[in-house]
C-alpha cells in the first residue's frame, strides 16, 4: 500500500506511532482475515501447493497438515486486516483541474490514500517459537512457510478488494525492516 510517512510531522514520534494515532483518529475499518482464505488453509490443495512451493518432500505432507491444523484456531481468533482512507495533505500530490474559462479558481483534486495493515496474530509467532524451543525446527519452518503463503494470498485478496470496492489501486506495499523509512523497530507500534 502507498504509505507516505513523509506527510507527517515526526519530530518526536516515530512514523509508526504517527500512523497508529492517525488510523485511530480516523474511521478505521478492521476486518477478520479473509474468511475464504482461512477456509482453504487446511485443504489438500492449499497444503500440497505449500509443500511443492517450499520444496518439502511428499512424506512431509502429514506434518504440514498437523501444523496447519494447530495454526487454524489461532488464525481464526487473531488474524485481521485494517484499513484507513485519508486525503493527501502533501501539496506535491495535489492536482488542479485546470483554469476555468471565466477565470475562476481551479478546483483542487486531492488524491486519496489508504493505509492498511495485515497480521496473522501474535499466536502464530508463539507457536513458531514453541516449536523452535522444543527443537522441532521442521515444524517451526512449516509455520513460517504456511504463514508466508497465507499472507501472500492475503495481499492478493486485499488487492482484489481494493479494485472491487474503491476507485483506487494498490501502488505498492511497504514492510517494516525493508527500507530506511520503515525500520523494523516500528513493528511494536503498529
How should each PLM-predicted stretch be described?
Residues 19-139:
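Active-site helix-to-loop segments that bind/position phosphate- or nucleotide-bearing substrates
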Residues 61, 77-86, 160-176:
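Flexible, glycine/charged-enriched surface loops at secondary-structure junctions
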Residues 120, 169-190:
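Short terminal or interdomain "cap/linker" segment that borders an active site or interface and mediates
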Residues 137-156, 160:
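Compact, glycine/acidic-enriched structural inserts
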